[in-house]
């Protein structure tokens, strides 16, 4: 179902402009969650060596996450102190286009627009359910999904609705998180690529989980696919040909972008954090124990695992972020060694299989001795590769900011409890720390400024200025409604 208000339909921009906006090529913008459809968390805009708080915006109510936390332990697998794997809505994550910052609220069901210079609220728009994931901005439009089961397209300038589509198959409502929500909430964000808006609706596989493609200008449905085995929760990712759908605590689903047909479910340990580290090379996690799984383009089995919460990939460097450490790796060398190690392990498995067959048929001792010798040689090679992988470390520092990590120019910005930090990417030197109100789960970088979102509903803006203004959302501003 599409509802439209044609007077607010802006003119269509050229296709090349959509590509630039959606994939983060416009240097000053951060138009979607973690900057681009790969969720890279990287901006080319540098941050000043010293920053000050320019303004802070306070919500009247803190975020209301859909999931309060992970179970304390997995008795069957004897895993204790499990990591939370569904943390996508613990803060109001900000996106930035031009001089405007946009975010959704899980507390009051609104989409907000702020002036990035002053923090003043410019407009807001009501949906009929919590808005748990950040909007996406493209071609002068703001796209966002809500727990009410709808995808909305708004005018980025004034918040007027352009169209809204019921992504859910019906308007059935159910109790959820103390609210009345759609039986098919939109909890995967909206991805814009090549004039198409992609979204999902549904988190109960037995009810059907819908993946759909819409015309980004008109909202017309292009295709719809339904899966009945996995949920859809977490930020969608898009490559040139594929869509990646985080599945909450389960492993991501890979689909064809042209048709929505499933390609595979990847192997791993689940979680809603995901990154495309070049092409279709996927990193995701954090699993039950805080592990990131790395898969290359094509194979479904793991290439490597890393102990960490998030990863930044920039050129030949990878920055790995864990609960206690931040480190930089020589990415190219590390991955080649990981490939070699994987190949050696595969050869070991084949030889061990051959030895078992010889044992079963009482094979000759000389043949067994030859295979055992080959196995020992492979063990030496494997140890050498493992040692070389450890030597790929460029630097490592203790880190008390484990909640989020982005890269702006040559500065890594990390969020922690009541504090954010700037770290020099080249050598790990801590440049500055600044206090914030609450746990800093979200950081956006644009135009030399950092926008930090916390779990108490605050949004802090830091830039190279001494200006400060503490702002509360105005109570008299007229709200837009569907």
What are these model-derived regions, one by one?
Residues 1-11:
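N-terminal secretory signal peptides that target proteins for export/translocation
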Residues 29-75, 165-167, 210, 373-385, ...:
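Blade/loop signatures of beta-propeller domains
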Residues 14-24:
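Bacterial N-terminal signal peptides
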Residues 67-84, 170-189, 223, 241, ...:
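Surface-exposed acidic, glycine/proline-enriched linker/cap segments
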Residues 48, 55-59, 106-117:
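Beta-propeller domains
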Residues 55, 78-83, 120-125, 163, ...:
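A short beta-strand motif characteristic of beta-propeller blades
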Residues 30-34, 83-111, 128-152, 179-212, ...:
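Repeat-blade elements of multi-bladed beta-propeller folds
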Residues 115-118, 155-158, 215-218, 256-259, ...:
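Short loop/turn segments that connect beta-strands within beta-propeller blades
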């Amino acid at each position: 179902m599409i509802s439209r208000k044609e007077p607010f339909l802006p003119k269509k921009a050229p296709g090349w402009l959509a590509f630039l906006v959606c994939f983060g090529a416009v240097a000053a913008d951060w138009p979607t969650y973690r900057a681009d459809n790969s969720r890279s968390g990287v901006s080319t805009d540098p941050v000043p060596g010293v920053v000050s708080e320019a303004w802070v915006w306070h919500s009247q109510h803190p975020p209301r996450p859909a999931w309060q936390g992970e179970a304390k332990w997995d008795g069957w697998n004897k895993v204790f102190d499990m990591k939370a794997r569904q943390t996508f809505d613990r803060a109001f994550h900000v996106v930035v286009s031009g001089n405007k910052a946009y975010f959704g609220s899980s507390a009051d069901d609104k989409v907000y627009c702020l002036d990035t210079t002053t923090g003043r609220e410019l407009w807001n728009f009501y949906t009929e359910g919590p808005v748990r994931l950040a909007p996406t901005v493209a071609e002068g439009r703001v796209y966002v999904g809500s727990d009410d089961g709808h995808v909305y397209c708004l005018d980025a300038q004034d918040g007027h609705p352009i169209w809204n589509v019921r992504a859910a198959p019906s308007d059935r409502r159910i109790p959820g998180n103390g609210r009345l929500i759609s039986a098919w909430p939109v909890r995967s964000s909206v991805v814009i690529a090549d004039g198409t808006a992609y979204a999902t609706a549904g988190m109960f596989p037995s009810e059907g989980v819908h993946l759909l493609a819409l015309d980004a200008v008109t909202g017309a449905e292009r295709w719809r696919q339904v899966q009945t085995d996995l949920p859809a929760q977490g930020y969608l990712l898009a490559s040139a040909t594929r869509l990646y759908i985080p599945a909450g605590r389960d492993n991501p689903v890979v689909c064809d972008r042209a048709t929505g047909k499933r390609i595979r479910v990847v192997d791993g340990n689940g979680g809603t954090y995901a990154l495309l580290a070049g092409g279709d090379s996927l990193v995701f996690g954090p699993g039950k124990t805080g592990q990131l799984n790395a898969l290359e383009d094509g194979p479904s089995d793991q290439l490597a695992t890393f102990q960490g919460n998030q990863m930044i990939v920039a050129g030949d460097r990878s920055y790995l972020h864990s609960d206690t450490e931040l480190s930089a790796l020589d990415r190219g060398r590390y991955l080649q060694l990981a490939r070699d190690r994987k190949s050696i392990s595969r050869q070991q498995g084949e030889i061990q299989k051959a030895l078992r067959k010889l044992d079963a048929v009482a094979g000759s001792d000389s043949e067994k001795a030859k295979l055992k010798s080959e196995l020992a040689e492979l063990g030496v090679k494997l140890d050498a590769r493992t040692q070389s992988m450890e030597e790929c470390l460029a630097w490592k520092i203790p880190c008390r900011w484990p909640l989020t990590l982005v890269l702006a120019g040559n500065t890594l910005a990390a969020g922690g409890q009541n504090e954010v930090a700037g770290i020099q990417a080249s050598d790990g030197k801590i440049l500055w720390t600044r206090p914030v109100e609450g746990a800093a789960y979200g950081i956006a970088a644009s135009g030399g400024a950092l926008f930090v979102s916390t779990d108490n509903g605050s949004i802090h803006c830091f830039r190279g200025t001494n200006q400060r203004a503490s702002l509360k959302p105005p109570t008299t501003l007229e709200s837009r409604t569907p």
